[in-house]
Regions:
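Short functional linear segments
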Residues: 1-46, 53-66, 70-71, 107-115
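Nucleotide phosphate-binding/pyrophosphate-handling subdomain across enzymes
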Residues: 38, 133, 138-143, 149-162, ...
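C-terminal helical cap/extension that packs against the catalytic core
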Residues: 201-220, 235, 303-306, 312, ...
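Active-site-proximal loop/hinge segments that shape catalytic or ion-binding/gating pockets
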Residues: 413
Length: 427
């Protein structure tokens, strides 16, 4: 296969959906030589914030001289963005070569009467093959969904698990209580490892503590009472945490302070594991971390922000950030959601702040909530709403309505933010 053929192949496989479970993934990797067994991992789960924490840690590790793999999903701007080494996307040739091998292994499985691997399983196997080929010193690995039964959880060579903030999401797959969801997220914890956790609601924290005790793991949790001296701006922030004074981050959004504190806890854990991370390397890594799509400013006059707040917990943080960064400002929204999310609560939290809201539909995704249906839901909270027939049209409408002193907030499903950013930038 060439690159285009490999992408078409994976797109075709993705139409069959995804399932939770590890047997098919284990069999696929066995046929590929179990590349994951030759790597070391930082495994990251959670509902919100896991991608940001991964970005902080991988940037710090790369800056300290460790060849660092990064596996994330979904991505905003390029398919190849999901697999990186030291910030560089996987090469098209490498992707095509490894997908060719994966497709052959999948065909062998089908001939043997075994279930065919899902697209996410194939992509995860692709990442493992590539990271092995690149001889990565460490891989920062983001869970796709949940943790316990996620395809990434076939790994056995983790040096540390990180659990970001847990809240109610994917309840159809992970469970209808916070404890059940936390059990899935904590399912990545391996025996005798270091575990670092965000501050959690009591119900979730109890599950994590019990899991760590059962598996003889040391647990470090963020103490938010030790966060101080927070100074926010749309271009970045500074804060202090425990013995770390005046740490600068380039990521905006009030929630990024909490994510950065979790990353600093991760740094301390890595130091316990003899990773050589100097204070200067940590500070530079925190300051230089880029994580597009999380309260990211795309332009000024008017200010345009894109943010992947797609569930109630994230919407609550977005609301807090909007009130903090834009007090008294006129806000216009471009909003797109998946129908399997609790979009009604997202609307309740965010819609009252907006002068006008334009709803859009994420193109080419069967989970997308139709723009007209989303507009009808918004109208129950804020009657100043319309729906657009495309993401580009929605962005154009918002920019036409907003004055230079106003702000346009494009948020919701991560899957449409890349297209929205292209529309803002005139691509």
């Amino acid at each position: 296969m060439n690159y285009i053929e490999a992408r078409v192949y994976l797109d075709e496989v993705s139409k069959y959906g995804s399932v939770l479970g590890l047997e098919s993934m284990r069999e696929l990797l066995r046929r590929l030589g179990d590349p994951q067994n030759e790597l070391k991992f930082i495994h990251i789960s959670g509902t919100n914030g896991k991608g940001s924490v991964l970005a902080y840690l991988s940037t710090i590790l790369t800056g300290a001289g460790y060849r660092t793999g990064r596996y994330i999903s979904p991505t905003l701007f390029s398919y190849r963005e999901r697999i990186q080494v030291d910030g560089e996307y996987i090469e098209k040739e490498s992707l095509a070569r490894h997908v060719t091998a994966i497709a052959a292994a999948a065909e062998e499985m089908q001939k043997a009467g075994l279930p065919s691997p899902t697209a996410f399983e194939m992509e995860t196997a692709l990442a493992f093959l590539y990271f092995k080929e690149k001889r990565c010193d460490i891989v920062t690995l983001e869970v796709g969904c949940g943790g316990l039964l996620d395809a990434t959880n076939v790994i056995t060579t983790t040096v540390m698990e990180v659990i970001a903030s847990i809240s109610m999401d994917h309840t159809d797959l992970l469970g209808d209580t916070l404890a059940k969801i936390a059990a899935q997220k904590a399912g990545i914890i391996k025996p005798d490892t270091l575990v670092v956790s965000a501050r959690q609601q009591e119900e979730a924290m109890q599950v994590i503590e019990d899991t760590c005790k059962e598996k003889h793991c040391a647990l470090q949790a963020v103490d938010e009472s030790r966060i101080s001296d927070v100074r926010c701006g749309a271009e970045g922030q500074t804060f202090s945490y425990k013995t770390w004074e005046n740490v600068t981050i380039s990521l905006a959004g009030s929630y990024q302070i909490k994510n950065a504190a979790l990353a600093l806890e991760g740094v301390e854990a890595l130091r316990q594991l003899d990773y050589a991370l100097s204070d200067q390397q940590v500070r530079e890594g925190m300051a230089h971390t880029v994580w597009r799509g999380r309260f990211t400013t795309l332009r000024r006059d008017p200010t345009v922000i894109i943010d992947g707040s797609h569930n109630p917990a994230a919407a609550r943080e977005l609301k807090d950030s909007l009130e903090r960064y834009f007090p008294g400002k006129t806000l216009y929204y471009v909003m797109g959601m998946f129908k399997d999310k609790d979009y009604a609560q997202v609307i309740d939290l965010t819609a009252p702040l907006a002068r006008h809201i334009i709803t859009v539909e994420t193109p080419g995704n069967p989970r997308a909530l139709p723009a007209r249906e989303l507009a009808e839901a918004v109208a129950r909270v804020n009657p100043s709403v319309e729906w657009a027939d495309s993401v580009a049209h929605g962005v154009e409408r918002a920019l036409a309505m907003a004055g230079k002193e106003d702000a346009v907030i494009v948020f919701g499903s991560l899957s449409f933010l890349g297209e929205a950013a292209d529309a803002v930038n005139g691509k």
